Structure formats: C-alpha cells, structure tokens
Design a protein with these regions (language model features):
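Conserved ABC nucleotide-binding domain
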Residues: 87-88, 146-167
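Catalytic Walker B motif of ABC-type/P-loop ATPase nucleotide-binding domains
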Residues: 184-188
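A short, surface-exposed alpha-helical micro-motif characterized by mixed small hydrophobic
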Residues: 226-228
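Helix-to-loop junction immediately C-terminal to a conserved catalytic motif
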Residues: 69
C-alpha cells in the first residue's frame, strides 16, 4: 500500500438499523463456575456518546467488554447491537453487527507493515486479496483522520515492530475504525502513552463521537482523561453497576470516593439501591 484514499459514500457499510440504539445490555451476568464476575448489568449507550467505565481492579470492566464483543461470553442476559440481538457466536459475528474493539495490549502483527495491517482490516468488507498488486487503499474518514494526525499516512511501508508504543496504539485504533464500527470498545487506550499522546487520543475520540456519531465505551484508569472526554461515567464494583451519571455526578460522589479508598460500602450501597 502506497496511497490512502477516502471511501466513497456508496462504498461504506450500510448502517444496520437506522435510528436503533447502538448498544443495549439487559440483565447481563457472567460466572466462572461458582464465581460471579458480573451480576445483572443493565446499560444503554447512544450515538455521539463516550461512556467511560471505571472501577477498581477486579470490578468486572474487561469482562463486560468481552461479553459485548464475544457472543459466547455471557452466562445470562442479552446484548443488543444496532437493534439486533447478538446471539451466541464468535467475535467476528459481533463485528458484523457493528462492534470494533481495541485491546489493552495492542494486537497488531509486528511483522506486517502499516499498510498491510490496514488492508487486512478491510479484507472482510471488500473481499480483496490480502496481498494484491493495488497500491491504493480506501479507508473511512475516521481512520484517515488518525493516520494523518499521527503521520502514519506517510509511513505505510514501515513495519509495525519499528513503531513507538504511541504509534502502535494509534495504528490499532485506525485498524479498528477501518472496519466501520458504530460501537467502539476501548480498553485503556492511553496506557503507556506520553502526556502529548494522551491529549491527541482524547481529542480524536471526542471528534469521533461528535463528528462520526460513534458510540464509544471506554475503560480507563486515568481519571483526569476520563473527566476530559466522557459524556457519562459508569461505575462498576464487585461485578455490579453501582452508578451511572454525568461526569460531575460521578466525580463528586461519596460512593466513588469510598470505592477507591477501600472503605466499607454496605451502608452506602443500601442507600443507592
């Protein structure tokens, strides 16, 4: 790949259900034997929203992401994506319903070039040969915006292994966006990034939610970053959804302070319920 071009409007993936809620979770639970990791989670997320999921280690945040992106994960309950109920199926079937996911540790092939990673992302949609003689590649505007902002559009021939950690994170986000998701799941996208890189990623995510209409779910331990980018914050603790509110409501909550300080929560949780 030597040249990147924007997708024509009629080349883009047709939205699965016009006007449908991008993500709705009903009564979702996940158990491993007798250990209940998630309990009766109910949650909706809309277009143009960045919903941050916070909570201490072991709260069930990454498990929730897995349940959304893999139909085999939930023990009980249901996940609706763009108006379609996601049945029990492998992750690729969920991708076809409009979900894109970026992992805590980048999942790129280090031996491929930047351009090859992007072509691979488009393979399922375009059915073009992975290693074709075409030197151009058409990508959604959202993916192009990140590539241009980070200079990766000028480094298409460079192998992933030679990229900095920050550029690998940006490339993985571009690869996910190349699949044209309507629901974007991000697991600690700022982990290991410099302050400058965190600011850039934050600006890009806000831009994607507002201009591209994406529904973004974000797991993040950097609470300053969460404050800056979030439309809403959801608090998980011991597998339960304890709080779902605006940034100001959650940041100023006594419950959140208690969770992060390790205080006894029994009385506070009774008040919430």
């Amino acid at each position: 790949v030597q040249h990147l071009k924007p997708l024509e409007h009629n080349e883009s993936r047709v939205e699965l259900s016009i006007g449908a809620v991008p993500l709705r979770i009903e009564g979702l639970s996940r158990s491993y034997g007798s250990l209940k990791v998630l309990s009766e989670i109910n949650l909706e997320a809309q277009r143009n929203e960045i919903v941050s999921i916070v909570g201490p280690n072991g709260a069930g945040k990454t498990t929730l992401m897995r349940c959304i992106s893999n139909g085999y994960e939930p023990t009980a309950g249901s996940v609706w994506l763009n108006g379609v109920k996601a049945g029990r199926g492998a992750p690729h079937s969920v991708v076809e319903l409009g979900v894109g996911r970026s992992f805590q540790n980048t999942s790129l092939f280090s031996s491929l070039t930047v351009g090859e990673c992007l072509r691979l992302a488009r393979y399922r949609l375009e059915r073009q040969p992975m290693f074709s003689y075409r030197t151009d590649l058409r990508l959604p505007e959202a993916a192009l915006r990140i590539l241009k902002a980070t200079g990766l559009d000028k480094r298409l021939q460079e192998k992933v292994i030679n990229l900095s950690h920050g550029l690998k994170r940006a490339l993985e986000l571009s690869v996910v966006l190349a699949t044209e998701p309507t629901v974007l799941l991000l697991d600690e996208p700022t982990a290991g990034l410099t302050k400058t890189e965190r600011i850039l990623i934050g600006e890009i995510l806000v831009d994607l939610s507002k201009k591209e209409g994406l529904c973004i779910l974000l797991i993040e331990h950097d609470l300053d970053f969460v404050r800056e980018v979030s439309s809403r914050i959801v608090v998980l603790h011991q597998g339960k959804l304890l709080l779902d509110g605006s940034v100001d409501e959650v940041v100023g909550s006594d419950l959140v302070r208690a969770i992060y300080s390790g205080e006894q929560l029994n009385e506070t949780m009774e008040d919430v319920s």
